[in-house]
Amino acid sequence: MSRLFLAPMEGLADYVLRDVLTDTGGYDGCVSEFVRVTGSLLPARVYERETPEILAGGYTRSGTPMVIQLLGSDPEWLARNAAYAATLSPHGIDLNFGCPAKVVNRHGGGAMLLTNPELLNRIVASVRAAVPAHIAVTAKMRLGVSDASLAIDCATALAEGGAASLVVHARTRDHGYRPPAHWDWIARIAAAVDVPVIANGDVWTVADWERCRAVSGCADVMIGRGAVSDPFLALRIRGLMDGSPSDQEWPLVLRQIATYLKKLHARIASCHEHGRVKLWLSYLKRTWPQAAELHAAIRRMQDSLEIERVLEGLPGAATAPE
């Protein structure tokens, strides 16, 4: 059976949304937003804040294993931080070689590292040597910066450095998130390396998942924004829910939104809560027209309690008990 993973999504899939989405079900694992590593050893409180799953043995509340993702460009400091992070009960250490954000790339991190296969190899080898053998070290990459000319060289460098598996987002950095994802390139990479490759990019529906697997040749798939747009996508892929979204599911989505807002109360400042809910609704609009109506209704609201009252007034929005 194909495995399904919830992707790391910086600025989108924080701990609270990871908790809500994995609680919905269908995922074999999830990866945290990246933890940025510079020239210091990060203390436990950073991981407790960014990856609270470590306080529960490395699992989300639903029991989904969580992998900590690190982002940086210095092999020594990444290795030191990975060695410490490995003591905190994650189910693996993932290395970010795909972030397209300008602020990250400006400092030589994320996708910018795809210009230097030799450095990629040194980073993975250093981290692999520093982390106990029973903890997997994995990597997530894009196809390159402006083109895919070094894609196979980079993937080979990562695999030879000791990465247990590779997630390949089938776009370059400059491609951003614009469609289409080039799943055929994932197939080329998978044929060139001796480690498992997990396909990623543009999986919004069950049909997309089927096409992605067929074109890439990969059994396993990592889902990102498609999971945010349709929280039931993993269950649809597994055949546990209808293959296409329906109006009958909207009350379930409302309950998820209400639960999400409730959980945000305990995690972030109230002045930021409204923005997170609106951000999620902006993705849900792709799947449910009702989300567009709700987004329009709360668009100017900045008080999360006011948004909560709107949700409470909608049929089916009552949250499930904790």
Swiss-Prot record:
Molecular function terms from GO: flavin adenine dinucleotide binding; FMN binding; tRNA binding; tRNA-dihydrouridine16 synthase activity
Active-site residue numbers: C99 (proton donor)
PROSITE patterns for this protein: UPF0034
Residues bound to FMN: P8, M9, E10, Q69, K140, N200, G201, D202, G224, R225
InterPro entries on file: Aldolase_TIM, DUS-like_FMN-bd, DUS_fam, DusC, DusC_C, tRNA_hU_synthase_CS
Catalytic activity: 5,6-dihydrouridine(16) in tRNA + NADP(+) = uridine(16) in tRNA + NADPH + H(+); 5,6-dihydrouridine(16) in tRNA + NAD(+) = uridine(16) in tRNA + NADH + H(+)
Record-annotated site: Interacts with tRNA: R36, N96, Y177, R276, K278, Y283, R299
EC main group: oxidoreductase
SUPFAM superfamilies (alphabetical): FMN-linked oxidoreductases
Enzyme Commission identifier(s): 1.3.1.-
Alphabetized Pfam families for the sequence: Dus (PF01207)
Family, as annotated: Belongs to the Dus family. DusC subfamily.
PANTHER family: TRNA-DIHYDROURIDINE(47) SYNTHASE [NAD(P)(+)]-LIKE
The name this protein goes by in its record: tRNA-dihydrouridine(16) synthase
Species assigned in the record: Cupriavidus necator (strain ATCC 17699 / DSM 428 / KCTC 22496 / NCIMB 10442 / H16 / Stanier 337) (Ralstonia eutropha)
Phylogenetic lineage: Bacteria, Pseudomonadati, Pseudomonadota, Betaproteobacteria, Burkholderiales
